Structures are given as C-alpha cells and as structure tokens.
C-alpha cells in the first residue's frame, strides 16, 4: 500500500486546463513543450520550461495551489458512473485520477509565464502570445501555410522543418493530390494530368491556346468578364490558325503549368475547407500553388498565409537537381530536370512576377535555417494581426499586404540585431530597466523601457490589454548594469517591440535594410546615436500598387513575364563582396549546425527519463519503488548505456571513451562524427544558464544516489 501511495505521489502525466466556461484541454509535457516552441521559445528552453512547470505543479499534488481570487490545483475526480463501468474501465479511471491534475486557465498561464521569466524571456505581450499559441494547439483556431514555388527550390524540406518547428503534424504536398487524381484516369485519357508541370505545355495544342487567348483578349476589350478555359484535346485542325502572334515555348510552358494547377486546386479547396471545419492547422507545399489561384483560395479561407519560395541563382538551382538523378549527374540526357531547367526557371519567373503583383512575401531560400525562422516568425506575427482584427487578405486590392509587411518586418529586425546582443540594462543612477540592443563595441543601438519584473511572471504583461513597454529610446546610454535576456524567435523577435510610430512595425525604420535581408547578402546595424525614423517605407509601396485583379486576363503582363524575366535577385546589381557572400553560403541546403538546437532536447529527454523516472511523450514510468515508497536509483547497466549513448562521463575525456579495439576506419569515422556533433556533456558544461536545470530541481530521496561508474580503460 505504501508503494502504491509513493508511486501515486510521484507521477504527473497530464494537466487538464479548465476554462471559465467549463471547457477543458489535457496537456502532456511534450504538448506543452510544442506549445512553447510555437510561440518562439528555443527548443532546449521549451523542454526545460515544460519540465519545470510540471515539477512545480507535481509538488502540490497533495494540496491545493491557491490563486488570488480563483481556484487552485485540484485532483481529477472519478465520474459518477465510474463504479458501474466494467472493471477494466474502472481501473483506467483510477489510473487517470493518480496521474492527472486540474488547473484553471489563469493559474496555468501565470505558472508558464513565471517559468519564462526565470529563463529571461522578455516580450511586450508574452501572456497574450502564450494564450494565442494555446488556442492553436487546442484547435480553437487554425492556420494554413502555403509554400508556393517551382521544382527544386526546397519547398519539401522547408515544409518538413516548419511543421516540426510549429508542431503541425499535417504536411501535404500538391504532388500527392495529383497522384491521387491520376488513379481515377488513365494517361491516354488525360495526358496533361500525367505530365510534370515543367513540360505540361507539350500536352497542349499551340493553335488552341492561341485561339483561346485571342478570344479572351477580345472579350476583355469588349468589357465582358469571363473565365475562359482552354480546349486541351488535339482535335482542332492545325490549319485553323487564329490571328495574332505565334505562341512561344516559354508561354506554352506557363500555359501548361497553369492548366495542370487549375486541375489540382479544386481538390485542394475541398481539403482546406475540411481542415478549417476541424480547426486543424496544416502546411501545404507544391508547385501547383499558382498565385492566381491562391488569391482565389484566400477569398474563401481566412486561415491561409502564403509564401513564395525561390532560388535566385540559376547555377545553384541547377546543382540541386543532381541528387534527383540516378547517377548524381547534371547531364541533360540523363537528368530530366536539367533538361527542362529553362521551363522550370520560366515558371519561377512567372510566379515571382505574380508574387510582386499580389504582394506575396518572397523567400530567397539560400539558407534553410534562416528561411524557416523567418517564416515561423511571420506566421506568428500574422496570428497577432489576425487576433487584433486585421484581415490578411484585402479584397479591395486583391493583395496580402499585411503578410508581406510582417515578413519585411522580420527581415529588417533580423538585419538590425544581427551584430548586436539583447540585454536588460539599467542606466547609471536609474532603477528603471531597459531592453536594449547592445552592439559589439558596447554602444546601445536601441532601447525600450520595460516595467521591472518582480519574479512573478508579470514582467511582460499580466493581461492582454495593459501595456508594459514604452517607446524606443535612441542615443548613447551610460550602462550601469546589464544582463542577457532571451527574445521569442531570437533576432526576429525584435519586430514585436514598439517603434517610433507606436506600433510594432519595423518596415520603415532602417534604410535599405530590407534589400540586404531579403537577399541574405548583408546586414545593417543602426548607429548608437541614430535619430528616430518615420514609418513610411511600406505605405508608399501599397499606395503605388494598383488594385490587382485575380484573373488570368492580363495578357500583356503575362506575355511580358514570360519573355522578360523579373528582377528576382540577379547578381548584376550586387557588389563583389555580396556576390562572394552568396556563393560562400550553402544555398538551398541545410547547414550541419542549423538543426542542432531542435535535436538537443532529445538527449535531454533521454537523461530526464533515466534520472526522474518517466518519459515525456508517452508517460511510461521506469522508476522502481520499494516497500517504503522510496525511489531507487536505476541499475548499473542502464547507467552504462546512458553514458555510452549520451556521452555523460565527466571523469574521462572523449579520447578515453573511444575503444581501442575498434578498427581504425570505424574509430576515425567516430572521431570525425564527434567533431561536428555536439555532445550532451559539452553542452551542459559550456552553455551558461540563467535558471537551474531539471536535474537540479529534482528532489533527492534517501537511497537514490547514483552508483559511480568507472571509466572504460
């Protein structure tokens, strides 16, 4: 009986958050970790903060954690008809009672904000951001992210990494929709559907295409609005030629791409409708997301946030197709993508021109890590704007100026703080704290007055309406005290802080920073004695852009886009240093260091499982209790396995842990892997901490000392 009691007091697997209206949602530790990562916390910090929240609530399982003016932590009570259920169901209800606690929503938010404050996270409206992330995770709201772009620009890689970063499990490619549609029709019946987008124009009749374009242009001149379609069969006689210019190869490639995209968009429309009804967030990527049709989808689905992915350098774009060939070759006779690279680039030029027309943000995918971070920050900023009542899609102009503005804000913020550090400072002789961007030389680039935090989680904002951050301050400041702080989304998070105009827009604060940030070729750090700038950068662009029509009737623009490539990042206007910086980057590939932070918490989960006695994802308990209810340490064999897997051996260096019995090739490969992969012990020794780790927070019971393991000789 004592063992069962000790085990019941040691386990907390579920936290049921109760709203004022009685609605509930169950959080596990991994789900809370995903929620914190969605709101912009680092993966490692999100893991530790989620564990800290569970440990704090677990310490109050015996009693109630009182909250001023509200309820506290309560145990999960059995249902009234639980005893009448089957014995198996009754045992499960007893298990849930031992492992579940109920907590009101305000107390839950306060505890998480308190843990964020301990890890030095500061934000203008941190509590509202947390509540917004919880609504997405609890499926009270949804977001649909569309990654448009041609073949080989990195959409699939971005969608996978973005889904992992946002905690979105549904990642759909339009190629899978096309593959599903192919199962209902044979290739002979519809060759257009079975063709690839870059050579779909070969399935069209140039005469029929020219005739349809001529009729559409004539009806447009007469003032009749219609959505004409192209006759895709080849039954029209070739000698029946319409009047006008002959259709070129580039224009035929675009027409074939648009024709196949139109066939796929209809099925995607129905899928998005079902996802929005279920409040399910999703990431959709694919070449079939033509921006003309995307604008039509945004009229019906307010949850859509589009992005245009492209590769500016044609040479780097071509090199990415080498991995798709059988023999890793760029020979056009053996690599169909290289064979049709001209059509692929033509489609990209067409999509870039459409993106400029509809103000869809264009992401130059020269670095996957930076692209994922910028898209993540932009998506959450759009969620803030949507919660404030702003519409992402403007039906009057048929543009998404809000999304484009927020993306530019993120890029400008990243360029502003790329060479600075975020610190919470105090001026000499003043007790007021300032959140500042401190340059490498120690000068202050920009600072914001913030309300002093008393350590109870109220440093950001206790409610969503009260303001705790003042207007920015410029000029040299005499720093008396400084401490490092963390921002949500890292360098991109500075865009959420107020500007001179009293809003959170950074679009017009730095001259020409957007061009450098968009191309990834440079950064701009404002001067420490700079003067405030006016917010007029993006407003002028919106006023000058005419109301864009969402149809394909703009023949002159389409033909011009097909013949004259737009300025989508050519190297002619760049300096030699910028060109060198572009070529030195790993364009379109994942840097070996970019995903380390996302994978570090896996090692922490392993260590936490062995030391604290439970897994974070599935709740499996590995702790052994004795007759007195005390927790024993794990076995020696488990400690040896832990040391082997996680390399936690503080008594011997890495060289002593390498086995001399292994072959030379295996040993050298192991040493080579160790040079680029950061071990868990090194991260614990070298990384400075602003809050105690989970191991230090775990209470030490008698008899739980970990046996010492002798190092391998």
UniProtKB/Swiss-Prot annotation:
Residues 218-249, 504-575, 650-713 are annotated as: Disordered. Residues 656-668 have a biased composition (Low complexity). Residues 551-562 have a biased composition (Acidic residues). Required for the accumulation of phytic acid in seeds. Phytic acid is the primary storage form of phosphorus in cereal grains and other plant seeds. It comes from Oryza sativa subsp. japonica. This is P-loop NTPase domain-containing protein LPA1 homolog. Residues 504-531 have a biased composition (Polar residues). Disulfide bonds: none annotated. It comes from the Eukaryota. Residues 231-246, 533-544 have a biased composition (Basic and acidic residues). InterPro entries: P-loop_NTPase. PANTHER family: P-LOOP NTPASE DOMAIN-CONTAINING PROTEIN LPA1 HOMOLOG, P-LOOP NTPASE DOMAIN-CONTAINING PROTEIN LPA1 HOMOLOG 1.
């Amino acid at each position: 009986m004592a063992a069962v009691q000790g085990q019941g007091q040691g386990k907390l697997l579920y936290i049921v958050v109760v709203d004022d209206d009685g609605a509930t949602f169950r959080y596990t530790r991994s789900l809370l970790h995903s929620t914190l990562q969605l709101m912009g916390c680092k993966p490692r910090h999100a893991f530790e903060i989620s564990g800290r929240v569970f440990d704090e609530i677990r310490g109050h399982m015996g009693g109630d954690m009182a909250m001023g003016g509200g309820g506290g932590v309560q145990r999960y009570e059995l249902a009234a008809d639980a005893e009448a259920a089957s014995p198996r169901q009754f045992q499960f209800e007893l298990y849930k009672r031992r492992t579940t606690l109920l907590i009101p929503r305000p107390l839950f938010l306060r505890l998480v904000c308190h843990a964020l404050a301990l890890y030095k996270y500061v934000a203008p409206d941190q509590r509202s951001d947390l509540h917004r992330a919880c609504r997405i995770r609890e499926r009270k709201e949804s977001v649909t992210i569309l990654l448009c772009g041609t073949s080989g620009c990195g959409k699939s890689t971005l969608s996978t990494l973005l889904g992992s970063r946002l905690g979105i499990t549904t990642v759909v490619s339009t190629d899978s929709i096309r593959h599903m549609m192919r199962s209902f029709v044979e290739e002979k019946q519809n060759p257009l559907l079975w063709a690839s987008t870059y050579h779909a124009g070969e399935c069209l009749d140039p005469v029929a295409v020219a005739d349809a374009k001529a009729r559409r242009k004539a009806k447009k001149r007469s003032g009749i609005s219609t959505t004409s379609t192209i006759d895709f069969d080849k039954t029209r006689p070739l000698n029946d030629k319409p009047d006008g210019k002959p259709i070129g190869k580039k224009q035929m490639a675009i027409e074939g791409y648009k024709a196949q995209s139109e066939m796929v968009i209809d099925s995607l429309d129905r899928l998005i409708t079902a996802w929005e009804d279920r409040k399910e967030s999703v990431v959709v990527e694919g070449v079939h997301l033509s921006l003309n049709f995307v604008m039509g989808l945004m009229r019906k689905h307010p949850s859509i946030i589009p992005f245009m992915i492209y590769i500016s350098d044609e040479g780097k774009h071509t090199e990415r197709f080498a991995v798709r060939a059988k023999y890793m070759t760029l020979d056009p006779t053996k690599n169909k993508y290289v064979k049709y690279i001209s059509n692929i680039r033509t489609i990209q030029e067409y999509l870039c021109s459409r993106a400029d027309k509809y103000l869809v943000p264009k992401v130059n995918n020269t670095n996957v890590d930076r692209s994922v971070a910028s898209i993540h920050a932009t998506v959450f900023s759009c969620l803030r704007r949507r919660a404030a009542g702003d519409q992402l899609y403007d039906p009057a102009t048929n543009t998404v100026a809000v999304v484009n503005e927020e993306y530019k804000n993120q890029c400008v913020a990243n360029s502003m703080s790329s060479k600075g550090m975020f610190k919470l400072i105090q001026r000499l002789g003043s007790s007021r704290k300032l959140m500042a961007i401190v340059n490498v030389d120690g000068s202050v680039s920009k600072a914001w007055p913030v309300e002093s935090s008393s350590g109870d989680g109220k440093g950001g904002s206790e409610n969503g309406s009260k303001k705790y951050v003042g207007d920015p301050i410029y000029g040299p400041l005499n720093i008396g005290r400084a401490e490092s702080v963390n921002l949500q989304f890292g360098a991109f998070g500075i865009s959420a802080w107020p500007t001179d105009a009293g809003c959170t827009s950074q679009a017009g604060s730095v001259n020409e920073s957007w061009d450098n940030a968009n191309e990834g070729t440079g950064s701009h750090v404002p001067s420490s004695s700079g003067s405030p700038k006016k917010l007029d950068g993006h407003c002028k662009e919106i006023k000058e852009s005419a109301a864009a029509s969402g149809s394909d009737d703009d023949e002159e623009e389409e033909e011009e886009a097909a013949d004259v490539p737009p300025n989508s990042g050519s190297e002619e206007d760049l300096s030699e240093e910028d060109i060198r910086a572009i070529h030195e980057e790993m364009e379109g590939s994942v840097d070996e260091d970019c995903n380390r932070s996302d994978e570090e918490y896996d090692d922490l989960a392993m260590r936490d499982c062995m030391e604290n006695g439970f897994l974070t994802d599935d709740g499996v308990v590995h702790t052994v209790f004795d007759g007195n209810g005390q927790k024993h340490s794990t076995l020696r064999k488990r400690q040896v396995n832990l040391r082997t897997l996680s390399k936690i051996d503080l008594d011997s260096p890495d060289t002593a842990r390498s086995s001399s019995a292994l072959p030379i090739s295996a040993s050298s490969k192991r040493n080579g892997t160790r040079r680029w992969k950061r071990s868990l012990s090194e991260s614990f020794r070298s990384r400075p901490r602003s809050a105690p780790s989970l191991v230090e927070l775990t209470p030490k019971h008698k008899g739980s000392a970990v046996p010492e393991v002798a190092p391998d000789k």
